[in-house]
Amino acid sequence: MADKQISLPAKLINGGIAGLIGVTCVFPIDLAKTRLQNQQNGQRMYTSMSDCLIKTIRSEGYFGMYRGAAVNLTLVTPEKAIKLAANDFFRHQLSKDGQKLTLLKEMLAGCGAGTCQVIVTTPMEMLKIQLQDAGRIAAQRKILAAQGQLSAQGGAQPSVEAPAAPRPTAIQLTRDLLRSRGIAGLYKGLGATLLRDVPLSVVYFPLFANLNQLGRPASEEKSPFYVSFLAGCVAGSAAAVAVNPCDVVKTRLQSLQRGVNEDTYSGILDCARKILRHEGPSAFLKGAYCRALVIAPLFGIAQVVYFLGIAESLLGLLQDPQA
């Protein structure tokens, strides 16, 4: 990305388009990831991604899989735009006379991009997680209440697909957080978000750049779109799995509502210790498969849009009405 100059408006538009397309395609998988990661202490309301999605559809309807999507669709445009534009900016600043960046400089550029994006990512994730996990908590509480009644009366086990109670909206959550905690309420889990997104960008951007370079024909200035897509998918999934333990910690810290008998956490280290003690090392890989399936197409689509230069074409048409 450092080998060509792209205007800032084009970078922002490309990032926004990529984010909107990507989120629309993979959001249900992201919802399953959040619910799987928030299952504590061996509780198995959902056994897998497919089990989670099936039960969500049965209890909350088809659009239940898109709870929290409005938050992502609203904020993913600035988030992706900042991430891609920042990485491109840092790569350009670190390059000398168009020479290929060293691995260290590529990692530094990725680090800068990951740091910049958390300005938007943290509040977006904070709101999204509350909305995504509300269905799991409501279903769990309903089941436990029904089990309490049945233990005295006898009868069959209640189903996890039982109807859920009304849940808050993103606007209500934002108002409540601002009223009770101020702006800091929206940035709860900022440290954990940095701990996830900075390493992810450090892994992703250099890996993508090198994979994309490998697939570029010597006679062409840039890689074909399918090479950029595959490179984005491979690099994205690898980076996502690598930082999944940090994502589990972040998700737990940002969840304001807890199910029955679920742990509360005072910080990153406390969260990591309790997860390790109560659930074992494998708990840090909860949702890793889902996260890889989310990040792979998300970044693949982003790189295709970015490298095809869709925004440049749109801006060109606006600047030249006769084109």
UniProtKB/Swiss-Prot annotation:
One of its GO terms (biological process) is malate-aspartate shuttle. The keyword Membrane applies. InterPro entries: Mit_carrier, Mito_Solute_Carrier, Mitochondrial_sb/sol_carrier, Mt_carrier_dom_sf. Belongs to the mitochondrial carrier (TC 2.A.29) family. One of its GO terms (molecular function) is L-aspartate transmembrane transporter activity. Mitochondrial glutamate/H(+) symporter. Responsible for the transport of glutamate from the cytosol into the mitochondrial matrix with the concomitant import of a proton. Plays a role in the control of glucose-stimulated insulin secretion. The chain crosses the membrane at residues 12-32, 62-82, 107-127, 189-209, 223-243, 292-312. Solcar repeats lie at residues 6-93, 101-214, 223-312. Pfam families: Mito_carr. It is a multi-pass membrane protein. GO terms for cellular component: mitochondrial inner membrane. The gene is SLC25A22. This is Mitochondrial glutamate carrier 1. PROSITE patterns: SOLCAR.
